[in-house]
A protein has these predicted regions:
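N-terminal pre-Walker A segment at the start of P-loop NTPase domains
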Residues: 1-16
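Hydrophobic anchor at the beta1->P-loop junction of P-loop NTPases
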Residues: 27
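P-loop (Walker A) phosphate-binding loop of NTP-binding proteins
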Residues: 30
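Conserved glycine(s) of the Walker
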Residues: 33-35
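Post-Walker A alpha-helix
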Residues: 38-40
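Post-Walker A helix-loop "phosphate-sensing" segment adjacent to the P-loop in P-loop NTPases
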Residues: 44-55
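Conserved P-loop NTPase "ATPase switch" module shared by AAA+ and STAND
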Residues: 70-94
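Sensor-1/coupling segment of RecA-like P-loop NTPase cores
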Residues: 99-122
Length: 122
């Protein structure tokens, strides 16, 4: 996957719109600014589709990576924009960094910590 990708995530109350240009993007910010809400909306859309009341506009599939099976899931995803919240401890692991580097997915990681093992933009 190459190039820029515009992402719009919205429901009847909230509207997120942004563009990512690199394969790894970090979203940082203060508490209670809507970062985790964005992840939750993407997760709800993935689980419930249109019944969730959420719309996602993007030229690639947006998905959330989380849980204990993250390695298997990541190895089987291709051409996706993958969102990861900071509560997932695996983002600090070297194995995660190595899988990201060989992946053709784009990654949007929400964290307040520096991830020194990943080359990313903020």
């Amino acid at each position: 996957m190459k190039g820029k990708h515009k992402i719009v995530v919205k429901n009847n109350r909230l509207h997120y719109e942004f563009e990512i240009k690199r394969n790894i993007t970090i979203i940082k910010g203060d508490s209670a600014t809507g970062k985790t809400t964005l992840i939750n909306m993407i997760r709800q859309f993935a689980n419930l589709g249109n019944a969730s009341g959420i719309e996602i506009e993007c030229d690639a599939t947006c998905t959330v990576l989380e849980g204990n099976m993250w390695q298997m899931l990541l190895k089987n995803l291709s051409g996706n924009i993958i969102f990861i919240d900071e509560e997932n401890q695996f983002i600090r692991q070297q194995e995660f960094a190595e899988l990201v580097k060989v992946s053709d997915n784009y990654f949007v990681i929400i964290t307040r910590e520096n991830l020194y093992n990943l080359p990313y933009s903020v």
